[in-house]
Amino acid sequence: NAIPELLHDSGVGGVIDLDKVPSDDPSLSPLELWCNESQERYVLGVPAARLAEFAAICERERCPFAAVGVATAEQRLVAGYGATVASVYGGSGARGDVPGPAPRGGDPDGQGGGVAHEALSGPAPHGGDLDEQRGSVVHEALPGPAQRAGRPDDLRGSAAQAEIPVSGPRAQPAGVGEGADRGGASASAHPIDLPMDVLFGKPPKMHRDTVHPPVPHWPELATRGLELHQAGLRVLAHPTVAAKSFLVTIGDRSVGGLTAREQMVGPWQLPVADCAITLAGFDTVAGEAMAIGERAPLALLDSAAAARMAVGEAITNLCAAPVETLDTVKLSANWMAAAGFDGEDALLYDAVRAVGMALCPDLDLAIPVGKDSLSMQAQWDDGASDAAPASAPAHRSVSPVSLVVSAFAPVADASTQLTPLLAREADTDLWLIGLGAGKQRLGGSVLAQVHPGEGALPAFAGPVPDLDDPQRLRGFFELVRDARRDGLLLAYHDRSDGGAFAALCEMAFASHLGLDIGLDGWGEDPFRALFNEELGAIVQVAGENRAAFADLVERHALTECAQRIARPTTAPVVRVIEGQDVLAEWRWEELFDAWWSVSHAMQKLRDNPEAADAERAAARDFAAPGLKPRLTFDPAEDVAAPFVATGARPKVAILREQGVNGQIEMANAFERAGFDSFDVHMSDLVAGRVDLAGFRGLAACGGFSYGDVLGAGRGWATSVLERPALRAMFAAFFARSDSFALGVCNGCQMLSQLKEIIPGADGWPRFVRNRSEQFEARTALLEVVESPSIFLRGMEGARLPVAVAHGEGRAEFASAIEQAAARVALRYVDGHGQAATAYPLNPNGSPEGITGLTTTDGRVTILMPHPERTPRTLNLSWAPADWPAGSPWLRMFRNARVWVA
């Protein structure tokens, strides 16, 4: 689809030479070559006059590409082996190359790898210029030698415009060139030759005749006879409700340095956040919020209600972010169904009509994007019965109609976000704002799923939760917005799977607090009250603000929806109380173990089982201090200010290699401290375009150079050590008394393997696979150890949270003697300030928590964590409320500016 869609959006046609499409498999037929869904392939439309400029970009980035065709004024698509404008539109019909220079690759060193880019270039339609007529779609960067970054946004250098994104694998193997017989097709064949309207013209509307399926004969849950204590444990252990930490910690959530809210919340770092927030830039608090809603199980009973609930849940999740108006929210709808299966088409129609023709228009919500997957069924025969007819497969799996809604909205000030972390004030209440307005429907609920009915079937049936009044959702949104604006809310968590009980427990887990849950006036049935999954949220309000909050609820016409339901306590106990009676009581650890059970089981199967056990033991410790920072300096003090005021801006090379992805945030950190950051690719050094002699500092950035296939950082380091000119350049730089260097993450791994040419680096370890046998992305607590490091002067003794993201961060010393001689600069510690030796406080298993080292004179420092991603307090997953806007980690970079003086 990529090439035709790009041409169609530009109002042109194209001639594509299939011989030019890179492929490692010469046997592919034209159909397979054209229609396979290879990943990481991008199409770019490049003006022919600028193809050489584009080729230079690819060469610098070690990125293979191929020019595969030309755009034409006639809206006609032609693709074939040897297809050219001349062969299609006249002339001899012989093959011809794409007009303009058409290099076949951008990997001068022969190292391959990376993402291949195919460039679709050619004459502009109607004799004009594509840039002028169609506008620029993609901007590629071509920094000159050591081009000054200026602002981090300028790190890419001067932009070369390119229209249309494509790509392919590496260049063809030897012997597969023009004229080769691919899949039996003749070299001159044009297997694709058709007007663009055939692909993109308006097709006739599809008409389908379908009927609703019969109502499922599941039993309905009868709460009489259920045991409340056991029900709470079962609900928390259900995979839908249970903790998802095992999924969260394997994904890098801090890369880019613009994250303002990720899944983990609070000093104990539990994955209970309602939404994600990213910042729009390095110098603003404005940004974007994202949230998801889905209630697919309800579609088994009522597909329209399930769709409305998905939209509603996306909005209630998004309310944790400071979104100003509902009309700024945009939705993406991902529809899934088993089209053609008995009755599913009718259910899909019900769901689409409910959302697209009723709910969203009522709320002025737009759904500008989305996708559909309408083949959500599979059938197979296990071969047990050879006599079974082909029309009756032995097994069939059919997915219910499902809608996953992603909501996006701008936020003006990300610092005013709300999380489920409860404030530890003496007098606070937890209020439930329930949009069911007293309805407590249990159909399709997790409570129903964990209690079998007749014949061991889940007691799943009954009325399902629904968004009965769309304007009530609008009132809820505006209530939360106004209460936040007035400073009335201390914490927020939406009610969803598992009901209010699950939401309350997650707030208690994240805060290491107990709860007294009061049922007075909340309904006659404690099971329906606690476990119904109607839309809503729980908010924490200080006692002194009760009246103001109640008044605000009344002004938004939600009085019948709001009720005080719980109070936080410092005891490790959760109780459900009605009047003077305690209906159920759980130990905090008992509930937490149930909630953590799924994550622990999955982690134990996937990772080092000992690490999974250690994390569970640490997470369930109610008395654990969590992240407990300690400052030994004033982070608000800008020690570099006098030197920055002189106007001098020393030059720092922001060094990267193929696969490195942390250069933007590294440049930002140095720029904020008064340096000039320059984007330096290793290919610049290899080609002689840049020399390190022109820089005072060097920063080797994080990422995955060469995909870590030779070991983290090893390929990068070897590319220096095995090239005499580069080895001499780096050795000369490190030998200078006026130079400094910083290596972070992949850069740390790389510099550690250059220690033979770094004076004073004797005893540095190499960094190997984490003890957990897994990539670890967490917020950890670091202590600054007394050392010669120029980056850490005046920070000694401080304990600071920092982003961690690596798979090979365990320091491995050649001997105990070398470890004793190593100049340790940073180490992981626990909340008590002791060296962290246990997982996950020590996320990689390094001895004595060692994670940062320096040289004898302190000019070169390496560390595995990412201080450059957290130069602002807002970048930290959690920080004390009284910290200034500038993170303590900014002092590192300011110290370097002071040293350069």
What are the language-model segments listed below?
Residues 1-90, 179-697, 701, 706, ...:
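Glycine/proline-enriched, intrinsically flexible loops and inter-domain linkers
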Residues 49-50, 73, 84, 436-438, ...:
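Short acidic/polar capping segments at secondary-structure boundaries
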Residues 54, 441-442, 549, 664, ...:
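Short glycine-/acidic-enriched loop or helix-start segments at secondary-structure transitions
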Residues 63, 693, 737, 848, ...:
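Structured loop/turn residues at beta-strand edges in well-structured enzyme cores
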Residues 87-188, 390-391:
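Intrinsic disorder/low-complexity segments
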Residues 494, 745, 866:
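Active-site glycine-centered loops adjacent to acidic/histidine catalytic or metal-binding residues
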Residues 688-690, 731-732, 764-901:
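Amide-donor transfer/coupling interface in amidating biosynthetic enzymes
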Residues 704-789:
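Cysteine-nucleophile active-site neighborhood
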